Structure formats: structure tokens, C-alpha cells
A protein has these predicted regions:
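Generic N-terminal amphipathic, Lys/Arg-enriched alpha-helix
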Residues: 1-10, 14
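Active-site-proximal beta-alpha core segment in soluble small-molecule metabolic enzymes
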Residues: 7-9, 31-183, 187, 191-192
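Conserved, mostly hydrophobic/aromatic
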Residues: 15, 38, 69, 125, ...
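Short secondary-structure boundary/capping segments within folded domains
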Residues: 24-27, 58, 281-285
């Protein structure tokens, strides 16, 4: 079955432009970029574009995406950016050159798997500096584990240390956080008697320090995805005004109109909960013209944050497979069969690219 809509258009020329802008600015400050493709379900075309624009390494959180990219000819080095489970280690060693790690038991099991496969594997050991996701909270323990890797795990190479910020705890990357990571790296280097190759200062949110010129010297690696793919987190979410060298229109979502009618805006009857167990609040605006699109929460997650590309359209809600749009004020009189376009946020992109029934079209 060939499905035309919903359709996600990917403008590779915009992604290449964003990648060059980000990677060049990082390189000027001595920082290598790992191009992260988890936000697009590891689309090989996007991974290839990042690689061609200077990403020395590619990263994602899911091994299936690495396998798909390798099968499409997008080789390594690959970095696994989600700390792996013990059950995943055979594929980690088989598919990735490097992984993030935060548990001694996993590192010991990784050594055993490397022996079985006759390979070596590089690791970046993670520090938790307050965001409270992965990483060592006790820094003495972290130093001890890094020394253990260096001296007792011959098939596991201690490539460096890293941190994650913002993703869970919303904690901002600051020069002080980066200095704390550099101090941990220095302690480890003193114990092992050599320089660490990688001090990885975080993801897209840490790019703010590159943009502002406040990234401390010594941070030499960032894991960047959203800022290349969409460029919205920092420009829209953080309100950074002078980052307009990054375009935010690389992805366009198109959906088909399947019903247009004038209807009340306030549901009629006794209220319970909606299909997702919630109790929405409705505003009575009288009778208004509404369109239903063949697109739902199963496709993009939160519908209300979709950004219509057309004036006079407002997403007012929906369900798993339906998106309800107020079109009363739309200059174009929408009819059944018409197509509506949206810009996306990162969460929409995560959903849409992982749906097999959304057609993906690449341009430029």
C-alpha cells in the first residue's frame, strides 16, 4: 500500500546549512561535533548529510537506528548516547565504536563481550552535575571506576568523560558546570597518567556557550541533534534572538482534510474523560467552521503545539487519529481533500519519523 498523506517533507539543503553553521562554530573553538540523529529515528539520509558537513562522529540512542544506517552505507564511528543495558552489549560492541557508560557492572560485562567478539570498545564515562539523569553522583567513585577501566579492562578504552544537562532536570549548561567537568577530567588524568581524548560537554543546550563564546577551553566534544535538525529549542524555547543563522523550516508536515463542517465549540452532554484519560477544558465560542485532518496523537504526539503554516488556522485538539482545526478565520475556504501544512517541534519529529504510515519525502 502506498500512502501519500500524512507526509513529512525533509529539506536536506536546510539541514546541511544548519550542520555547517553549528559544526564550523564548534570547530573554531576546538570542539568536535557528534551529529545526533535520534530525533529523526536515525534516517540514513539525515545521518549522511551530517557526516558530509563535518560531523566526525554520529550518535543515537537506539541500536536499531545504527544498524539501519550501516546497512544503508552510513558507516562509523558511531556513539551510543543512551547508557546500554546488559542485554544490549553484544550489539553495542558489534555496531558502535563508542558508548556512554555510568555503571561499573556494565563496564565489566562490556569487557567480557569485547573478548568474545575479539574487539575493543571506547567509553565515555558520565558525570551527573545536577540534571539527575545518568552519571556518577559520587565523583570519588567515578574516578575509581575510570582507573579500573584504564588498568583492569584491556579491551575497553577510556576515551573520556561527559555530562548531560537540561534533558531531564532542565539545568542550564554554564561555564561553571563545564569547569566542574574539566576538574573531574583533570583528577582522572592525574590518576591514569595521561590526557583523556574526550571531554564531552553535553548536547544542544550546551551549544549556547559556543554561541556566546563562553565555553571554557578544554571542552572538546558536543553531541548535537536538535540544533541542526530544527534549531528551535534555543531560538524559540530559550528566546535567543541572534541565532538566526540557523533555519527552523527544514521539516514540513502535511495532512489531508477529511471533514469540514460548522459545529458548536462546546461539547454537548455529560462530561467524562477523553480517549487519553484527561479532562480537557473547552471554551464556548459558538458555532464555528471546523476541519478534521487525518492525523492524530499517534502520529505526532501533542497536537495542540503543531504550528500551522497558514494564517487563520488553530489546532484545538483531537484524538489518536484525528486532528481538529478551527478554520473559521482562514482566508482559504478549506474543503475535503485539501492539504494543510505544519511546522514541527522536536517531540513531533520524534513521533512522525518513527511512524511507518507517514510518508517521508526528501528534497534538495
Amino acid at each position: 500500500m502506498v500512502r501519500k498523506y500524512p507526509q513529512l517533507e525533509v529539506d536536506l539543503s536546510i539541514l546541511r546549512s544548519n550542520a555547517r553553521q553549528v559544526i564550523t562554530r564548534c570547530q573554531q573553538q576546538g570542539i568536535r561535533v557528534c551529529g545526533v540523529v535520534k530525533g529523526v529515528d536515525g534516517l540514513p539520509e539525515v545521518a549522511r548529510a551530517m557526516r558530509l558537513c563535518g560531523a566526525e562522529e554520529l550518535g543515537t540512542s537506539r541500536l536499531e537506528q545504527v544498524e539501519r544506517c550501516r546497512a544503508a552505507g552510513v558507516g562509523g564511528p558511531w556513539l551510543l548516547i543512551r547508557i546500554p543495558g546488559l542485554s544490549e552489549l553484544p550489539d553495542v560492541v558489534r555496531l558502535c565504536e563508542t558508548s556512554l557508560q555510568s555503571e561499573r557492572v556494565t563496564l565489566d560485562a562490556l569487557e567480557e563481550e569485547c573478548v568474545l567478539q575479539g574487539k575493543t570498545h571506547r567509553v565515555i564515562v558520565m558525570a551527573d552535575l545536577g540534571d539527575l539523569r545518568e552519571g556518577f553522583w559520587d565523583k570519588d567513585e567515578m574516578v575509581d571506576v575510570c582507573v579500573h577501566v584504564e588498568r583492569e579492562l584491556p579491551h575497553v578504552e577510556l576515551a573520556g568523560v561527559g555530562v548531560n544537562l537540561t534533558c531531564y532536570g532542565s539545568t542550564k549548561p554554564t561555564p561553571e558546570k563545564m569547569q566542574a567537568l574539566l576538574a573531574i577530567a583533570a583528577r582522572i588524568e592525574k590518576h591514569i597518567g595521561r590526557k583523556l581524548e574526550i571531554v564531552s560537554g553535553g548536547a544542544t543546550s550546551s551549544y549556547t556557550l559556543v554561541h556566546w563564546g563562553t565555553m571554557p577551553a578544554g571542552i572538546n566534544h558536543l553531541r548535537i541533534g536538535e540544533n541542526i535538525l530544527l534549531g528551535k529549542d534555543l531560538q524559540v524555547g530559550w528566546g535567543i534572538q541572534d541565532m538566526d543563522y540557523l533555519r527552523m523550516d527544514g521539516f514540513t508536515l502535511r495532512a489531508e482534510v477529511v471533514e469540514v463542517r460548522e459545529k458548536p465549540t462546546y461539547p454537548i452532554g455529560e462530561f467524562a474523560i477523553d480517549a487519553f484519560g484527561r479532562k480537557p477544558v473547552y471554551v464556548d465560542r459558538g458555532i464555528r467552521r471546523r476541519a478534521i485532518l487525518a492525523l492524530g496523537r499517534a502520529d505526532v504526539g501533542e497536537l495542540e503545539s503543531l504550528i500551522p503554516r497558514e494564517a487563520g488556522l488553530t489546532v484545538i485538539g483531537g484524538s489518536s487519529d484525528h486532528c481538529i482545526v478551527d478554520v473559521e478565520d482562514c482566508p482559504r475556504r478549506l474543503e475535503v481533500g485539501d492539504i494543510v501544512e505544519f511546522s514541527l517541534c522536536y517531540s513531533h519529529l520524534l513521533y512522525a519519523t518513527s511512524r511507518s504510515d507517514i510518508t517521508i519525502q526528501f528534497v534538495n
